[in-house]
């Protein structure tokens, strides 16, 4: 049954496993939503061509794809940490403690956006029950409520940081992955992530000086930022592995676009992606090999 004086802590370990399962479910829902959007956009013609040829729709699909690939990387890597901890790795317990609420907080909430965009892209057909989109939206909303609504889970991320210092092993893992990204064309993007890690660390260190109400307001932005740092490090590292094995720059490009979308400072009125970025969408979707020239330096 466990220790009498550690009931809540033991219960939270069970909840954390359930949260990982919930995040993985949401990642699968997002992938289905992306597939539905691609099938529709390729098959539906408008303005003398397929919908997927239109820049705004391509931008929506690309953003959905980034969300899907990042979520898959996060849940699978978190599951690997759980396996190590479950086989006796004490050092991974602290890491798993913060990974699960981070993943649950962002992925299940983001699934609401991705499924809604997929429904919107299909138009009126997406709203009616003859198509899968309406069910995907409902299921996405349910997932963000299970095992704690988003604000509650964000506060749990903050507790894991303040009470257990779980952000330190997380930052160490992120930094270790980024050190293994040796492709020169990816270095500017790696540097952007490392800069974001340091600014996030300073922000967290400043919580001790805040009143409780002010500190709690920091919980959700911090949880979101930690997710983006984790996801970016995973995508870039996976991209390095893919490049080393088959000289394919696809995943490095996806990682760079993720950093560009979520971590690089930009004018909020500017588009998230350039026409050049969108030009690679078909190759990314098809998992065709991308050349090194796909990677470019971040905008100043």
Language-model features: locations:
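Flavin-dependent oxidoreductase catalytic core characteristic
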Residues: 1-300
């Amino acid at each position: 049954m466990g220790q009498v004086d550690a009931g809540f802590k033991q219960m939270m370990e069970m909840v954390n496993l359930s949260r990982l399962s919930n995040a993985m479910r949401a990642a699968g829902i997002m992938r289905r939503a992306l597939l539905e959007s691609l099938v529709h956009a390729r098959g539906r013609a408008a303005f003398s061509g397929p919908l997927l040829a239109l820049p705004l729709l391509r931008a929506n699909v690309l953003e959905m794809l980034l969300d899907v690939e990042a979520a898959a990387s996060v849940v699978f890597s978190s599951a690997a940490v759980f396996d190590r901890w479950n086989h006796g790795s004490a050092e991974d317990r602290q890491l798993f403690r913060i990974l699960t609420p981070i993943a649950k907080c962002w992925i299940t909430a983001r699934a609401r956006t991705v499924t809604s965009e997929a429904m919107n892209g299909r138009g009126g057909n997406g709203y009616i029950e003859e198509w899968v989109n309406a069910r995907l939206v409902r299921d996405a909303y349910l997932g963000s409520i299970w095992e704690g609504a988003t604000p509650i889970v964000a506060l749990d991320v903050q507790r894991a940081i303040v009470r257990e210092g779980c952000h330190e092993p997380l930052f160490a893992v992120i930094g270790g992955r980024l050190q293994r990204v040796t492709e020169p064309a990816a270095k500017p993007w790696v540097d952007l992530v490392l800069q974001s890690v340091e600014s996030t660390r300073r922000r967290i260190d400043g919580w001790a000086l805040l009143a409780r109400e002010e500190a709690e307001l920091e919980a959700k932005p911090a949880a979101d930022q930690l997710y983006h740092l984790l996801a970016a490090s995973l995508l870039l590292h996976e991209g390095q592995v893919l490049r080393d094995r088959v000289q394919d720059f696809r995943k490095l490009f996806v990682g760079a676009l993720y950093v560009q979308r979520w971590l690089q400072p930009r004018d909020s009125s500017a588009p998230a992606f350039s026409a050049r970025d969108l030009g690679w969408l078909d190759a990314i979707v098809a998992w065709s090999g991308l050349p090194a020239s796909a990677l470019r330096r971040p905008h100043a």
